[in-house]
Amino acid sequence: MSTPRFSTNDVTVVFFLGGPGSGKGTQSANLVKDYGFVHLSAGDLLRAEQVREGSQYGELIREYIREGKIVPMEVTVALLSNAMAESLATSPPPAGTKARFLIDGFPRKLDQAVFFEETVCPSELVLFLDCPEDVMETRLLKRGETSGRDDDNAASIRKRFRTFVETSMPVVDDFKKKDKVVWVKADSSVEKVYEEVKAGIEARGLQAR
């Protein structure tokens, strides 16, 4: 059994999950500003890595993203772990406080959660944005008009919904059994959702900084 790279005495990890278009990006920005989280998006790290000069994973990641499939977890976890180490080295938290990492869009499957917690760091909680598919689809199609992202089209969006329900919901359900989920309804205004998010994480002992 390997020892995790980081100790929960030094870092607090919150997994941030929700279907595509549930509003994680917007809420993440608020949490960074008010709670001192470092925001790590698994998707952003993968997208950056696929175009990084000399990347050993670039071609592999491109292929998986194009097919709408989940990238092998060893790759994603390595990128997250390295990003955490880099953040701690370049901008450590204030003395006497723990670094806070908001890991967005990860874990996408149960085995990823287990692998991350065994090798990188056990998580504090899972923040889950629960949003109806029709609301998410409308948001994503609107975003697709300007985002230039290959996967913001109707067919790809529905495929992503299916993948999320089949693979990521079991993660949420598993953490719920351990009483580690802050479950927020995410189909109202950004402000209202954020109020619920704040209330949920503060009830778990994470205060604003």
PLM regions with names:
Residues 1-209:
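Glycine-rich phosphate-binding loop of ATP-dependent small-molecule kinases
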